[in-house]
C-alpha cells in the first residue's frame, strides 16, 4: 500500500497476498458468505496529492466499475471455480442477509428482473481516465483480466450496454428497503 501511496488508501487497508488467500479460503468454506464493495470515490486531488502522502489521501477506492469483472476473472479464470459462486456471494447471500430476498437475490417470478449478461472471454483493462466515477485515480490502473459485462438490466430495463450507460435509463435507480 505504501508503494502506491494515496491511490491505495482504504479501510480496511489492502492486505498481503497471504491474507487474500486466507479470505478466499473463508469464502470457499462458507465462513464468509458475502462479498461486497464499499465504493468510496474521491476527487483526483483527494487521492493523488503532489507528495503522494498516504496520510493526507482520502480513504476509499474507485473500484465499483470493475468489481464484477475482477471477481469473475479471479473466480473463473484464475481459480477455475464455477461462476455460480459469484452469484451466491454477491447476490443471493447478501439479499438473504440484508432482507432483500423476495425482491432481489434470485431470477424468479415476483423478483426484480435484475441481470448482468457477461461475456466470459471479453478482455478488460482498468484505465484511470475511463472510470465513470467522481475521481479517476485508482490503485488498480493497468490491471487486466477476462470476463466483462455486455448488458446490465435493472427491474427489466437495460441500463448499460457494451460498457456505456444507457442515457434513457438515467435516474432509474431506486432505494431498496428490506422486505422482511
What kind of feature is each model-predicted range?
Residues 23-25, 105-106, 142:
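Short, flexible, glycine/charge-rich loop motifs used to bind or transfer phosphoryl groups or to couple energy/partner
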Residues 49-53, 109-175:
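C-terminal cap of metal-dependent C-N hydrolases
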Residues 8-18, 57-63, 138-144:
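A short acidic, glycine-rich active-site loop
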Residues 5-8, 28-35, 41-120:
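His/Asp/Glu-enriched, well-ordered alpha-helical/loop segment
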Residues 10-25, 97-99:
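Active-site glycine- and acidic-residue-rich loops that bind
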Residues 10-13, 36-37, 155, 161:
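Thr-Gly-centered strand-to-loop micro-motif
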Residues 176-180:
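Terminal leader/tail segments of proteins
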Residues 1-3:
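Surface-exposed extracellular loop regions of Gram-negative outer-membrane beta-barrel proteins
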